[in-house]
Amino acid sequence: MLISCTLTTETPADFSQFISCRKGQQQVNVVQDWRPLVEKYFKPQDVDRAMRIIFCESSGRSNAVGKNTNGTKDVGLWQFNDETWRWLKPKLKIQDDRFDAETSTAVASWLVYNDGWFHWNSSKHCWGK
């Protein structure tokens, strides 16, 4: 877990790295309530990235719904799209819906460890490096 941006930047001259660190830290702080759940499903080295994705995708709101121009919706903490969820539901034998934070986090970790982080590339400008 990141303790302080001042401990991770080598010199004060590297202000852009400090700003980037602070932005990431603020993103993680907003969604701290979800940390125990994320820690349950993600490897320790992936927890902060997962927390940033939750911030960028839904601002930590498990009831978030994003409507797309093609008529589909992105739903829940991880903003799973209708098409993605339709594909995953039978594959993973999912019983709950995308609004269920535990289910969507478990599915997100399955996707990451079986297929990579690219499923959230549309928001990578927010969470990625």
Which role does the model predict for each range below?
Residues C56-S59, E83-R86, N114:
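Amphipathic alpha-helical interaction surfaces
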Residues A13, I19-S20, Q25, N114-K129:
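Catalytic cores of secreted/periplasmic lytic hydrolases that degrade extracellular macromolecules
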Residues N70-P90:
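Substrate-binding/active-site groove segments that recognize
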Residues V30-W34, V38, D46-A50, N81-T84, ...:
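Stable alpha-helical elements in mature extracytoplasmic
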Residues F42, L88-K89, G116:
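Secondary-structure transition/hinge residues
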Residues M1-G60:
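Export/targeting segments at the very N-terminus of extracytoplasmic proteins
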Residues S58-V65, D115-W120:
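Secretory-pathway/luminal and periplasmic proteins that interact with or process carbohydrate-rich
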